[in-house]
């Protein structure tokens, strides 16, 4: 299983956004990360428990705390969709 790190794509497995893909933007502590859907799906930028995420093998090259526009550009450059 891939590690949770900055730029890693993941699927939300718990809560009302279960099944949605997100991008990890920042690591807050050992239990929480900051994720975003980058305006490409209904997941807004928010803190999320690592236990509620299933990491995917895909990873994009972004800086820590990147804004949604930078994340969207990196996803388009890599040819990855969050749909």
UniProtKB/Swiss-Prot annotation:
GO terms for molecular function: RNA binding; structural constituent of ribosome. HAMAP family: Ribosomal_eL14. GO terms for biological process: ribosomal large subunit biogenesis; translation. This is Large ribosomal subunit protein eL14. Pfam families: KOW. Keywords: Ribonucleoprotein, Ribosomal protein. SUPFAM superfamilies: Translation proteins SH3-like domain. It comes from Thermococcus sibiricus (strain DSM 12597 / MM 739). The gene is rpl14e.
